[in-house]
C-alpha cells in the first residue's frame, strides 16, 4: 500500500492523539514526528497479521508519543536553588517539570480528589479505587470528572 493512501485514510489518528494529550505547544513538531513514524510503521506492517492497520498505527503511535514525552521530561530537569543562598556551590535540588506540575495540581484538589489521583497514577483501575476508598463506582467517576475539570480549567 502506498503511503499516500495510508496517510489519507489514517492521518486523523495523529490529530486524535495530539488532542488526547492536549498538545497545543509544538503541535506541528509533534505532528511531523508522528507522521514520520507513521511512514516507518506503514513500511513494516504485515497485512496478514490479525491486527488491522488502523489499530496497529494507533497503538504504535500512541506508545511512540508517550516515549517522546518521557524523553522530553528527562531533558527538562530544572535546578532550583534557594533564594537565600549567597553562592551556587551549595547542593542544588532537582525537580523535573512533571513533578512541579503535579504539585500544582495537588494544591487545587480536595482530599478525596488527591487520593483518587494518587491511586490512578499508581495504575489502579476505577473499580479498585472504589474498593480502596470505600466509595461507589459512580462517586469515583464524579471525582474523576471533577479532577479533570479542575485541571483543564487551571492548566489550559
From Swiss-Prot:
Q: Which Gene3D superfamilies is this protein grouped with?
A: Winged helix-like DNA-binding domain superfamily/Winged helix DNA-binding domain
Keywords, ordered alphabetically: DNA-binding, Sigma factor, Transcription, Transcription regulation
The keyword Transcription appears for this protein: yes
Q: Which SUPFAM superfamilies match?
A: C-terminal effector domain of the bipartite response regulators, Sigma2 domain of RNA polymerase sigma factors
What are the recorded GO MF terms, alphabetically?
DNA binding; sigma factor activity
Q: Which biological process annotations from GO are given for this protein?
A: DNA-templated transcription initiation
Q: What does this protein do?
A: Sigma factors are initiation factors that promote the attachment of RNA polymerase to specific initiation sites and are then released. Sigma-S contributes to the protection against external stress, thus playing a role in cellular fitness and survival.
Family, similarity comment: Belongs to the sigma-70 factor family.
This chain's protein is named RNA polymerase sigma factor SigS
Which species does this protein come from? Staphylococcus aureus (strain JH9)
